[in-house]
Design a protein with these regions (language model features):
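N-terminal metal-binding scaffold of metallo-dependent hydrolase/deaminase domains
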Residues: 1-51
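Alpha-helical scaffold segments that flank or form the walls of functional sites
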Residues: 64, 81-133, 139-154, 180-186
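Active-site core of metal-dependent hydrolases
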Residues: 165-174, 186-295
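Histidine-centered catalytic micro-motifs
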Residues: 66-78, 134, 221-230
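C-terminal helical cap
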Residues: 11-16, 122, 277-282, 286-292, ...
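Active-site gating loops and adjacent loop-to-helix segments of metal-dependent hydrolytic enzymes
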Residues: 79-111, 236-254, 272, 324-338
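His/Asp/Glu-enriched, well-ordered alpha-helical/loop segment
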Residues: 246-253, 299-350
Length: 350
C-alpha cells in the first residue's frame, strides 16, 4: 500500500543571494509547499501554484533547513538523567582514561536511560543522524553497547545512526578487547573504532592492521580517534591511508579529531589532503574550544575536496561539563574561530 503524501504549506526556503541599495548581500527566500511521502521530499511547489488538494499544515513562513548530523558522539558516557555532577580536572589523556575507568561499572546499568536522554536532546536540536562511539573494554564488556543499541532502536523511526565499536581503553592492551569488539560487530555494531595507535596502543601498524582486519571481516566502515600530534600523528594518518590502499578497502572511513593535520610539513600537505579526498576519508571535528587542542584546517581540507563533519563529542560527562549538544552552537563557534562574518561565508558554513 502506497503511503499518503503529507503537504507542508508556506515553508520558507533560501533561493539565492542579492544586494540591497547599500550593496550589502542578503539571502533571498520564497515560500513553497513541500510534498513529503515516506519521509522523503517528493516535490517542492511554489506556494502560488498550490492546489486545493495540496493544502496541509500551514508553517506560516518558517524557514526550513536540512537536518543536522551529529557525526561524533559518545551516548554511553553522559550523566544526563542522573542529576548534576561536574567533571574532574586531569593532566592528560591517560589520566582521563583512568578517571573514566573508575566509574564505568557504576554507570553501566543506567546506559540505556542516559543514552535515551541524550538522544532526545540531540533530536530536539535538529539532528536526524547520530554517529556514536560506544566503549568496548574489559571494564564493562558489552554492557554499554547493549544499552546504547536499545536506546537507538527506540528512535529508529526518527533518526538514522551508526554505532562505532570503540576500544576506549586500548585495542591491544588486553587480548579480550578484540574478542569483545568482534562480538559487538556480530550484534549490530556498524563501524570499527580505534584510539591513538601510537599514544595508547604503542603499536601503530599492529593497531591499524587489527582495525582493518575487523572491518573487512564484518564488511563495515572505520572511524578512529586520533589525538596524537606532530610527526607521529602525521605518520599514523599516512599509514592508515597506506593500509587502505594496499587492501583496496572500499567501506566508509573517517579519522576523528586529527589534530596532527596542522603539523603536516608544507611540502607534503597537498599530497596528504589529496589522498584523504581521493579515498573519501572524512575528518570528524568537534571544534574544540580548548587552548590545549588545535582545530584541524577545516577550510583548507574542504577546498581540497576532503569531507569534514562536526559533532558534539561527549557532553555532560566525565570528559566535559560544558558542551550543550547544540550543533548550531558548534557552527557558530566554528564561524567565530575562523573569522566568518559575511552572508556568503555564514551560509556556506551552515
Amino acid at each position: 500500500m502506497t503511503a499518503s503524501i503529507v503537504y507542508l504549506n508556506n515553508v520558507r526556503l533560501e533561493t539565492g543571494f542579492a544586494k540591497d541599495h547599500h550593496e550589502l548581500t542578503y539571502t533571498k527566500t520564497a515560500r513553497y509547499t513541500l510534498a513529503i511521502q515516506e519521509g522523503k521530499i517528493q516535490a517542492i511547489i511554489p506556494q502560488n501554484q498550490v492546489t486545493e488538494k495540496q493544502q496541509g499544515t500551514d508553517l506560516n513562513g518558517q524557514l526550513a533547513i536540512p537536518a543536522f548530523q551529529e557525526s561524533h558522539n559518545h551516548l554511553d558516557k553522559t550523566y544526563l538523567s542522573l542529576g548534576w555532577r561536574a567533571s574532574q580536572p586531569v593532566k592528560n589523556l591517560k589520566e582521563r582514561l583512568a578517571d573514566e575507568a573508575s566509574e564505568l561499572k557504576l554507570l553501566a546499568p543506567s546506559t540505556e536511560q542516559r543514552a535515551t536522554a541524550m538522544i532526545e536532546k540531540l533530536i530536539g536540536y535538529g539532528a536526524s543522524y547520530i554517529r556514536t562511539h560506544v566503549n568496548i573494554d574489559p571494564y564493562v564488556e558489552l554492557e554499554n553497547f547493549w544499552g546504547v543499541k536499545r536506546a537507538l532502536e527506540k528512535y529508529a523511526h526518527v533518526i538514522d545512526y551508526d554505532i562505532v565499536v570503540f576500544p576506549q581503553h586500548g585495542l591491544l592492551k588486553n587480548p579480550h578487547t578484540v574478542l569483545l569488539m568482534r562480538e559487538a560487530l556480530k550484534n549490530g555494531g556498524t563501524m570499527v573504532g580505534g584510539l591513538d595507535p601510537a599514544g595508547i596502543d604503542y603499536a601503530i601498524e599492529e593497531s591499524l592492521e587489527t582495525i582493518f582486519d575487523l572491518a573487512e571481516e564484518f564488511q563495515v566502515g572505520i572511524d578512529i580517534h586520533l589525538h596524537d600530534t606532530g610527526e607521529v600523528g602525521v605518520y599514523t594518518i599516512d599509514k592508515f591511508l597506506d593500509i587502505l590502499e594496499e587492501r583496496k578497502f572500499t567501506q566508509r572511513t573517517a579519522i576523528s579529531h586529527a589534530f596532527a593535520l596542522l603539523d603536516v610539513r608544507p611540502a607534503e600537505k597537498e599530497k596528504l589532503y589529496q589522498r584523504l579526498a581521493t579515498h573519501q576519508t572524512a575528518i570528524m571535528s568537534t571544534i574544540p574550544y580548548d587552548p590545549r587542542y588545535l582545530l584541524p584546517p577545516i577550510d583548507v581540507l574542504r577546498q581540497a575536496g576532503v569531507s569534514v563533519h562536526l559533532g558534539s563529542d561527549g557532553f555532560f560527562d566525565s570528559w566535559s561539563s560544558n558542551v550543550s549538544g547544540d550543533l548550531f552552537e558548534k557552527l557558530r563557534n566554528f564561524c567565530e574561530m575562523t573569522g566568518k562574518i559575511t552572508e556568503e561565508q555564514l551560509t556556506q558554513a551552515y
